[in-house]
Design a protein with these regions (language model features):
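Charge-dense, helix-prone N-terminal extensions
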Residues: 1-126
């Protein structure tokens, strides 16, 4: 899957169980949540400017490894830098890797939900 534009990002995130979208901060920052917790944030104006990026949750050790390995991955902008990375598109992160990082973020957040909420989400029809 290639995420070339905001529509494809939207469809990729929405294809996961229990995902909802929100604008909790301002009308520019699109936030995807699972079970009421954020796993992906992006700025709509940055997409329009051609400089899109995502804020994604990441395992703290892996986050450090990724930042060392990729120029386009930095500590999370306006987020806990231990648990979040900012990943820029059009850099040295492949589309496949971008999808893996979104999946990793979703899984981390999903696993942090209560068993009851996890079960409710798994029972949803997608």
């Amino acid at each position: 899957l290639l995420i070339m534009d905001i529509q494809q990002l939207y469809e990729f995130c929405q294809s996961k169980k229990g995902v909802t979208e929100h604008f909790p901060f301002d009308e520019d920052t699109l936030v995807f949540k699972v079970g009421g917790k954020m796993f992906c944030l992006t700025s709509l104006s940055e997409w329009e400017k051609g400089t899109p990026s995502l804020n994604l949750k990441c395992d703290p050790e892996r986050a450090l490894e990724l930042r060392a390995e990729y120029e386009a991955i930095e500590p999370g902008y306006h987020m806990s830098k231990v648990h979040w990375n900012t990943v820029r598109f059009h850099g040295d992160v492949s589309d496949k890797m971008m999808c893996e990082l979104i999946n990793h973020s979703y899984e981390l957040v999903f696993k942090s939900l209560t068993k009851k909420v996890q079960q409710e989400i798994q029972e949803l029809e997608n």
